[in-house]
Amino acid sequence: MATCAADLAPLLGPVAANATDYLCNRFADTTSAVDATYLLFSAYLVFAMQLGFAMLCAGSVRAKNTMNIMLTNVLDAAAGALFYYLFGFAFAFGTPSNGFIGKQFFGLKHMPQTGFDYDFFLFQWAFAIAAAGITSGSIAERTQFVAYLIYSAFLTGFVYPVVSHWIWSADGWASASRTSGPLLFGSGVIDFAGSGVVHMVGGVAGLWGALIEGPRIGRFDHAGRSVALKGHSASLVVLGTFLLWFGWYGFNPGSFTTILKTYGPAGGINGQWSGVGRTAVTTTLAGSVAALTTLFGKRLQTGHWNVVDVCNGLLGGFAAITAGCSVVDPWAAIICGFVSAWVLIGLNALAARLKFDDPLEAAQLHGGCGAWGILFTALFARQKYVEEIYGAGRPYGLFMGGGGKLLAAHVIQILVIFGWVSCTMGPLFYGLKKLGLLRISAEDETSGMDLTRHGGFAYVYHDEDEHDKSGVGGFMLRSAQTRVEPAAAAASNSNNQV
């Protein structure tokens, strides 16, 4: 949405030149203000996903580790803010730079400037901490707190920003928005909101963390058979899932970063606002179909209607559609969600056979479904939407008649993300293990980190009247199966006195 004095002069006459300049400047200011408000609101929605991650993680672990996993989610956001401010944003979007890594804006120096204002930093920080939150789920219930500090800072300050520079910056070697050199296969990578940049990065990092640490005590029996260590609260899992669903409407539609932009002749549907709405619809359909497919797929597999499996299936659909949400039709999003559900089910079965333990299925969900989403986009991206967002003459989906160039670029993306994260996070986790800084002791793991590392339990119930009568201040929930009730504690206390 833009105008200029030359556009208005024929209407107002030559004597109105100053007036037209003034009006055009006001139009430009209004457009910038609306776009900034849209981006800030999207950033707030994406940040709200941290609450969803916290609730999802808390419900997926045993009660004795609840405080630990929630503290790591707070740490991801807080440490991520500092290190993304100091280094991460510069590595990701510092321009001018080379195709590999940015080299401006350290500590937000020289900000704001055209194209890079503080709202954009906040939006990108919310994405960076989402990747770190994914990884924390893979290594839950057995990782030392200092290891979280180290990996979170490294991931948000260096590993993730480099990948986002490749794919999203104007200088990145694989970016579809590249302005400083040739596009990869004449196309660049269309990873609109980060199936690869966010979800694969977090998932592959979690894969290496979980592999190097090994499974939790009791996860597999002496014969190698899988033993379910179920999370303690399906209610928290559902709450976290809905919060993440809500936040995804900032994650995917918000990745347009602006809303007042026209695509052609003036008209209600010829603008970016229509693309924003379509992106919200494709996101909704992919997640919903993935949830339903998982519901019936797991019912056939296990004989149960499992709400936790459905929630994970839903999130897998969201992770998959994130790459192509803006460039595919709603009917294609249904295919994306359907396939992503089976990708997750299959990878979970493979993980059990390989004795791979990921308490939140993060590597399978975000890594596996994210990779599928990258391939899906290369198959189903529609020419009209690609050209509206990225420019005319771009390759589009193979199944839509666009040839194989986009698919080739996306295969390269999957390979380089897996290789980069493996070469950076793998040695980091291995080094932490050799230094004795990665895994907690068997005694601490058995007792639970809330008690041994955080000074108490997550769930404490106090009843003042009961306390006055019995001298016992309530109960602490020690695990999903074991807790001390006030009445039982009072009876025990009376017996001891006798």
From Swiss-Prot:
It is a multi-pass membrane protein. PROSITE patterns: AMMONIUM_TRANSP (PS01219). GO terms for molecular function: ammonium channel activity. Induction: By ammonium or glutamine supply in roots. GO terms for cellular component: plasma membrane. Expressed in roots and shoots. Keywords: Ammonia transport, Membrane, Transmembrane, Transmembrane helix, Transport. The chain crosses the membrane at residues 39-59, 74-94, 120-140, 148-168, 192-212, 236-256, 274-296, 307-327, 331-351, 360-380, 411-431. Signal peptide: none annotated. GO terms for biological process: ammonium homeostasis; ammonium transmembrane transport. The keyword Disulfide bond does not apply. It comes from the Eukaryota. It is found in: Membrane. InterPro entries: Ammonium/urea_transptr (IPR029020), Ammonium_transpt (IPR001905), Ammonium_transpt_CS (IPR018047), NH4_transpt_AmtB-like_dom (IPR024041). It holds the Pfam family Ammonium_transp. PANTHER family: AMMONIUM TRANSPORTER (PTHR11730), AMMONIUM TRANSPORTER 1 MEMBER 1 (PTHR11730:SF121). Belongs to the ammonia transporter channel (TC 1.A.11.2) family. Ammonium transporter probably involved in ammonium uptake from the soil. This is Ammonium transporter 1 member 1. The gene is AMT1-1.
